[in-house]
């Protein structure tokens, strides 16, 4: 503060020069308001906001891969030797968000590692595909022990949150697999559903993100529709849809309903728990290349290949709205979040699930999935050239982004979970930020 004089008064003659008199009485009244004004101007007088902590940087090579779940980060080192059929993989498991090394696993498989899941008690489930024929396989490993606890030629679909049962499937083909419920610690088969019994199988769409369905819906060869417990394999409800089975008969499960479509002729909806019929209407409800999503109070349908988004009324099956021009989308806490990621400048938009109208647009940002609190989403933007990253939290209610931090020299590959953000850097290392 330049050119400001403060009157300290005068020292009376004959008194010590160390004594400081009181401020002159006429000006004392202004000190209170002046102090208040300075506090307001300085933002409340508190300390300035602190920048986000520096990330934990883990050196990796370009051939190393990473897998992220809710509380673990797995680093899959490049297989040794490269290009052979039998490959030796080293997997390091880190605790999140502290990045403490927990265990190291050594896996010998005939191919590449596709999936990793924590089974509990230090056991790690590893899913792989055979490099020669593409057949799936799953092994459960102990730390620092290349001998599997068990191995089976199955592909992992999901594991229950309490780690008590896993859902897997195996040959003879991708269209007609054998579905199995298994004990993840021992590999014992708890129940099976053979392809000779069923024509089609589907699960509620929510399980694609949660990782495990509580119910499985099957259209049997004899024309019956049934619901099974994914934990026990027990059939809990059954019904026989009207009309004969056809080659184009298909089933889906979303929004509390199981939909049975008979080509372009008819669609019937059933309750997901009881299979009681809810409604029936002529024509298709689900397009051939559609994917249902639960965005209650409606059922949203994403069309593959950038075909846009639409929504139907779960009470009647009537088409409510359609929004074109979006190539990706997701439903977070009932909010429809769509994106235009194929454009030079990515953009997000929030749609009203009842009408499909655009509530707000968020240019330049990419969704990172459900955020730290209900009604929020993680978002980030990566500027190239420049390799500059910004990340934050999107409020799905008002469309505003709260910036959390920035970073330089980021190549991409960013992933969020509830605790961290992980991104690849230009030197192939990964940076891990606490959120």
Please state what every model-predicted region is.
Residues 1-435:
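Secretory-pathway ectodomains
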